[in-house]
């Protein structure tokens, strides 16, 4: 499809696609198109905008999944090149607020393509990174960066800053011993970028359209897109009930803990802000864009959460509310940010970002406020079933991160709750090449108030039917009702088979369609180890010897000779700590040589057969690319 247009046009379209795809999941949906036209302030009547969006969705959404993929986006432009609709669409894209167009420097753009990115995001992310990594000796050669220049896009080029930011968002994701830090060469830089991208994927970032070369060249829209995902994961990490029980203070009358657990981090943040605004006697807000533009809600929020000096060792911080009555919106925003600075929270937004209602940066600003000063007390006297707050298991987190890394929409925050209408599962079927009849068999949101659950249940029934009839999964005793109920064991059984098939498909594509199963992988592993003169071998994915990670480390060294520093590898009689050290090194090294491993070090130490299988399968995929 893309072959009919020039490389330059294709690159330009990729930029445009990135501007419309607000949540960065690789697809455009109708509400993103609405937001685009709203932001662009084009002189078009409302009915005309609706007509254009309807036409774009009709023309572009070839597989009728209510989303436009990049390929579909390209075909729209080919089909609508000269029409009024295409012109309006292009105007909307080019007028999107806060977009800075720069002449590109890559080969694709040498003919004058414009790369576009948000200056506001660059400014915000640079300041956040400068603060976060200020005392890291490994980043001294890059920091502090000037937020008003392109320093950021150069700074990420060797992969070190990206690796460090990933570890700040999800500690211990990357074993520091595997980051190349000294005397960097093009090869060792490539390894760092592999490590960063594969680790970002493992924590749930959608990196399908980003390659190491894009980062080395510092392509602004791709760098900012990846950084936002990494930063957001870190900001949202504790906005979750099992990690922060005081959030139960946000329960409303008649609600259970389960109701609260279904909310996304964004929804919880909004509820948190409104909880404090209500206590201040101020009207509630419905978003972090339009409703905060006048800064008044922020003034009240800061005043509510500022430490009152009533706890041991707590210093009182007084918020000066005099700026609240300032007539000028911009000056009022600046007064408010001066107060946020007293709390050490002047991050992500400038006064202009507040006044313009930049949704992404205001969300980050509020998330940072929550993390520093939640000002919530865990309710003690209410009849709350705290037993529900177990938090997700490692396996559940791995599955969730795998789904999100593939760009499913909506983003999966809670594994069971977010799969109850099966839309994510149906998207995963498409990823494993099982066709989905989006037109005739799938109900899509918004669901009707009456009978909403029936519509979701129909989707779940269809998902199970596809698994049995088209994917040939083993789904004995699993029905649509189980997915709809969020039954953990049965939902996991289906999700595991989806992930397993996805992993095996990658291998079969590399091996010219030859069928792959566990025995084929074990055989390949042992043959590769033996040919490289290694003494380790595995009998199956339950083999207790795997707990030392020596077979994994040897296999990595067999695939990429001399990549493993054996001085760092513990041998002999190993304690659990030694095994974990080896496993951390093995998982990061696998990612560094180019294997997209989702499993965690603990999975190797405990020899979890499913996750162990994915590790060896991913390494086999990397080894087959070498052959």
UniProtKB/Swiss-Prot annotation:
Annotated region (Actin-binding 1) at 105-378
Annotated gene: pls3
The record places domain EF-hand at 8-43, 48-83
**Family annotation (InterPro entries):** Actinin_actin-bd_CS, CH_dom, CH_dom_sf, EF-hand-dom_pair, EF_Hand_1_Ca_BS, EF_hand_dom, Fimbrin/Plastin
One GO term of the biological process aspect: motor neuron axon guidance
Q: Where is this region: Actin-binding 2?
A: 379-624
Tell me which SMART domains the record gives. Answer: CH, EFh
- Protein name, entry field: Plastin-3
Presence of keyword Nucleotide-binding: no
The free-text function statement in the UniProt record for this protein reads: Actin-bundling protein.
Q: One GO molecular-function annotation for this sequence?
A: calcium ion binding
């Amino acid at each position: 499809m893309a072959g009919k247009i020039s490389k330059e046009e294709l690159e330009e379209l990729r930029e445009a696609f990135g501007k419309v795809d607000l949540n960065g999941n690789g697809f455009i949906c109708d509400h993103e198109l609405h937001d685009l036209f709203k932001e662009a302030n084009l002189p078009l009547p409302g009915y005309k905008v609706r007509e254009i969006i309807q036409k774009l969705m009709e023309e572009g959404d070839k597989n009728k999944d209510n989303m436009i993929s990049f390929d579909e986006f390209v075909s729209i432009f080919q089909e609508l090149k000269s029409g009024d609709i295409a012109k309006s669409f292009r105007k909307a894209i080019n007028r999107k607020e806060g977009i800075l167009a720069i002449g590109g420097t890559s080969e694709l753009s040498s003919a004058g393509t414009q790369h576009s990115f948000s200056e506001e995001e660059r400014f915000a992310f640079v300041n956040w990174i400068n603060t976060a990594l200020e005392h890291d000796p490994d980043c001294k050669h890059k920091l502090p960066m000037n937020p008003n220049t392109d320093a950021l896009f150069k700074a990420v080029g060797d992969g070190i800053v990206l690796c460090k930011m990933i570890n700040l968002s999800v500690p211990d994701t990357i074993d520091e011993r595997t980051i190349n830090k000294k005397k960097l060469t093009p090869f060792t830089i490539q390894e760092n970028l592999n490590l960063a991208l594969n680790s970002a994927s493992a924590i749930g970032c959608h990196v399908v359209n980003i390659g190491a070369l894009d980062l080395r060249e510092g392509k602004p829209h791709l760098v900012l897109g990846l950084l936002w995902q990494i930063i957001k994961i870190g900001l949202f990490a504790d906005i979750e009930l099992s990690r922060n029980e005081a959030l139960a203070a946000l329960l409303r009358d008649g609600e259970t803990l389960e109701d609260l657990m279904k909310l996304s981090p964004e929804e919880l943040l909004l509820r948190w802000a409104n909880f404090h605004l209500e206590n201040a006697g101020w009207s509630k807000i419905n978003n972090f864009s339009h409703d905060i533009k006048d800064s008044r809600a922020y003034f009240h929020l800061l005043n509510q959460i500022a430490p009152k000096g009533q706890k041991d060792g707590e210093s009182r911080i007084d918020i000066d509310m005099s700026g609240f009555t300032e007539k000028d919106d911009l000056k009022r925003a600046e007064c408010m940010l001066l107060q946020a600075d007293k709390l050490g929270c002047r991050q992500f937004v400038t006064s202009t970002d507040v006044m313009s209602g930049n949704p992404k940066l205001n969300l980050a600003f509020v998330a940072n406020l929550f993390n520093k000063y939640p000002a919530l007390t865990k309710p003690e006297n209410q009849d709350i079933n705290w037993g529900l707050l177990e938090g997700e298991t490692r396996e559940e987190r791995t599955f969730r991160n795998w789904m999100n890394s593939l760009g499913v929409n909506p983003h999966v925050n809670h594994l069971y709750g977010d799969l109850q209408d099966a839309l994510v599962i149906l998207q995963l079927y498409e990823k494993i090449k099982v066709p989905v009849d989006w037109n005739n068999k799938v109900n899509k949101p918004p669901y009707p108030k009456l009978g909403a659950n029936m519509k979701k249940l129909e989707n779940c029934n269809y998902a199970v039917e596809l698994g049995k009839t088209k994917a040939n999964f083993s789904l004995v005793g699993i029905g649509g009702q189980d997915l709809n109920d969020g039954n953990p064991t049965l939902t996991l059984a289906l999700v595991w088979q989806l992930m397993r098939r996805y992993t095996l498909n990658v291998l079969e594509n590399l091996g010219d369609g030859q069928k792959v199963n566990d025995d084929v992988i074990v055989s390949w592993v042992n043959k590769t180890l033996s040919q490289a003169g290694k003494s380790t071998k595995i009998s199956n994915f339950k083999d207790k010897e795997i707990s030392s990670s020596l077979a994994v480390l040897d296999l990595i060294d067999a695939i990429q000779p001399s990549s493993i520093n054996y001085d760092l590898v513990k041998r002999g009689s190993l304690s659990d700590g030694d095994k974990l050290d080896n496993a951390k090194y093995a998982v990061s090294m696998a990612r560094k040589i180019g294997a997209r491993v989702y499993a965690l070090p603990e999975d190797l130490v405990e020899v979890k057969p499913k996750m162990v299988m994915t590790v060896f399968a991913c390494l086999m995929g990397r080894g087959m690319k070498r052959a």
